[in-house]
A protein has these predicted regions:
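Histidine-rich, glycine-flanked metal-binding segment
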Residues: 1-72
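Divalent metal-coordination and catalytic microenvironments
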Residues: 28, 43, 68, 79, ...
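Alpha-helical scaffold segments that flank or form the walls of functional sites
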Residues: 69-71, 75-77, 86-123, 128-146, ...
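Histidine-centered catalytic micro-motifs
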Residues: 74-85, 211-218
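Active-site mouth loops of central-metabolism enzymes
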Residues: 90-103, 154-166, 186-188
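Active-site core of metal-dependent hydrolases
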Residues: 157, 161-163, 176-278
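His/Asp/Glu-enriched, well-ordered alpha-helical/loop segment
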Residues: 210, 234-235, 281-360
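C-terminal cap of metal-dependent C-N hydrolases
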Residues: 349-413
Length: 413
């Protein structure tokens, strides 16, 4: 692949002024094996050239040495639960006071940002005793994260049909007016799943927003009806985690989902509170049928899943190790496909594309998915997070004689 040609920067088009926030990434390795310099400006990739070719140009802005790093399009998190994240770490009953929800949501988003996710979609329950309090807290967290990461919210009502569902429907309308960007929910928990989906789709069409629904897909007939209802809706419908889809119905169901243009978000790291079971969707079968499949984290250290790292690369690793995906396809599920779920533009390490990047210590993608400890995260053309890992071994005769690679400064006691 040839080097990308330089693109004019919006910041340099007026009076020759140069962008002080411009960034030059030097000596990064790409997945195709090239070692390159990458110049960023105005939130986009301005140029990609052979290593040393851009570094020799007159210096403007900052430089980051990425020797020994693999440079990738940044991943995204398509399925988080911001209102319950990290609630298992607290003693006693979980507090849903707005300040506590905001703190947990912010900490969880920063954790995932440190792993590389510069954009996140967070499901937030609305209605019942919480009303819109948790949503308001997560929206406040969204504002506090501005410039670091993009956080969008999904309003998740419990019931939408019958007498009990009237309040839920009113609450959902208020949530959209308040700032929720996506209509969500769990039709499997409603006495009338078909009516639930109809209400969601009607409201989404009215507001022109996406739909993102929870389902374990245990009832293939219900899933088929859901797919038929969702077909053709724009800007799109996402389902997940579909971890209980019966094997004997999986192939036909996959064809129905593909025909409807529905995206499936699987959760390789675990389940979430709105569904039961710990299975994983049949990823390879869905992909073979033409279904777009993305991967997310789901619950993060809450009552339904008290562990978890919220790491997109771990999700990709699990897709490769458990589901047999090639590392490239596994990473696509947490990057390109995940960004598509969020309605975000494509990212490539080429001139003209958004400067949403992740640099991980390593030479090849398979190794990065296995041992990606040190990371540098770029959002809108600037470094927003760094993680540095140093492994040290004590001095020993075996290490000295065998010439094993070591990091460290002297003996570790």
């Amino acid at each position: 692949m040839p080097d990308s040609q330089p693109q004019p920067s919006p910041s340099s088009s007026s009076g020759g002024r140069q962008d002080p926030s411009a960034l030059l990434l030097c000596g990064a390795r790409l997945t195709d094996g090239r070692t390159v310099d990458v110049r960023l400006g105005g939130g986009r990739i301005e140029a990609v050239g052979t290593a040393g070719s851009l570094a020799s140009a007159p210096t403007r802005g900052s430089r980051v040495d990425l020797s020994g790093y693999l440079l990738l399009p940044a991943p995204a998190e398509p399925h988080a639960h911001a209102d319950t994240a990290q609630s298992a770490d607290t003693d006693g009953p979980v507090s849903y006071a707005p300040e506590d929800v905001q703190r947990r949501a912010t900490e969880a988003a920063l954790l995932q940002l440190g792993h590389g996710a510069t954009a996140l979609r967070a499901h937030v329950r609305v209605g019942d005793v919480q009303g819109l309090g948790a949503l308001g807290a997560v929206l406040q967290a969204r504002r506090s994260l501005r410039g670091l990461a993009e956080l969008t919210t999904v309003a998740v009502p419990r019931l939408l049909t019958g007498v009990a569902g009237a309040d839920g429907l009113a609450m959902l309308r208020d949530a959209l007016k308040m700032g929720a960007a996506v209509v969500g929910g769990c039709p499997d928990l409603d006495p009338d799943p078909t009516g639930y989906v109809e209400a969601v789709l009607e409201l989404a069409a009215e507001h022109g927003c996406p739909v993102d629904l929870h389902t374990d897909a245990a009832d293939p007939g219900r899933l088929a009806r859901l797919a038929a209802q969702c077909g053709g809706l724009r800007p799109g419908v996402t389902l997940g985690p579909c971890g209980a889809l019966p094997a004997e119905h999986a192939s036909r169901t996959a064809d129905q989902l593909a025909a409807a243009g529905v995206t499936v978000v699987c959760l390789p790291q675990g389940s979430c509170g709105a569904v039961t079971g710990r299975g994983t969707a049949p990823v390879r079968l869905l992909r073979a049928a033409g279904v777009r499949v993305a991967a997310g984290s789901g619950a993060l250290r809450d009552v339904s899943n008290p562990v978890g790292r919220g790491d997109p690369l771990e999700a990709a690793y699990l897709l490769a190790s458990r589901e047999g995906l090639r590392p490239e396809d596994a990473y696509d599920a947490v990057s390109a496909s995940a960004r598509a779920v969020l309605g975000l533009p494509e990212v490539r390490v080429e001139a003209g594309f958004p400067a949403e990047l992740l640099a991980v210590r390593g030479e090849r993608l398979a190794g990065a998915l296995s041992l990606a400890y040190s990371r540098i995260v770029v959002h809108r053309g600037r470094v927003v997070a760094r993680t540095s890992a140093v492994r040290e071994y004590c001095n020993s005769a075996v290490a000295a004689e065998s010439g094993l690679p070591r990091q460290g400064r002297g003996e570790v006691s």
